[in-house]
Each structure stands twice: as C-alpha cells, then as structure tokens.
Amino acid sequence: DSMIPRFNRVELVKGDVNKTIPEFVKEHPGMRISLLHIDLDIYEPTKTALDYLYPLVSPGGVVLLDEYGMADFQGESLAFDEYFGENKPKIIKFPFTPTPGGYFIKP
C-alpha cells in the first residue's frame, strides 16, 4: 500500500466466513475482485465464498483454490464442483508444488 498510501486496499475481517462474507459484500456495493484466493479447506465456507464472491470476480480475474483435489480437504473440491456443475472451469496446477490445488482465469 505504500504506492498509494491514501487508499486502503486490504481489510482484514475477523469472524465466521459464513456470516462475514455476506455482510461484507452487502456493505461494499460495486466491489470488484481481481484475485480471489480461496483457502477455506471445508465445504460450507467454500460454498459461501463462491456464492457471494465469485460473481464479483472481473472477467480475466484469477480464482485460486488452495486445497482443490486434496484428499484431506475434500469439502473445498466438492463445493467447487457443485457450484460450477457441468460448466466447471479447468483447474491449472502449479508446476512448482507437489500438492494439488491450482487456479483458473474467469472468462
């Protein structure tokens, strides 16, 4: 933020994602997202994040799923697969890590 000190670009919100995300979106109409990093591990918070935040991702924006495809955190994958259904985007894996996860670019 030192490049543009008078504008706050980061806001940490403490609380239950299932409550704070809907409230945050309601309080910030017109918000757009260029990078959505989902690192929630389990189903319900991931579903909430997708329901409320994915529609705000700009075309060309990046969506990163930290635990997609991990056996220990199947909820994140399930929420993603259910959200997109037949229109599921192809997850691009990072070549520099042995763990699953990855990203896609919103059309």
Language model feature labels by segment:
Residues 1-107:
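S-adenosylmethionine/decaboxylated-SAM
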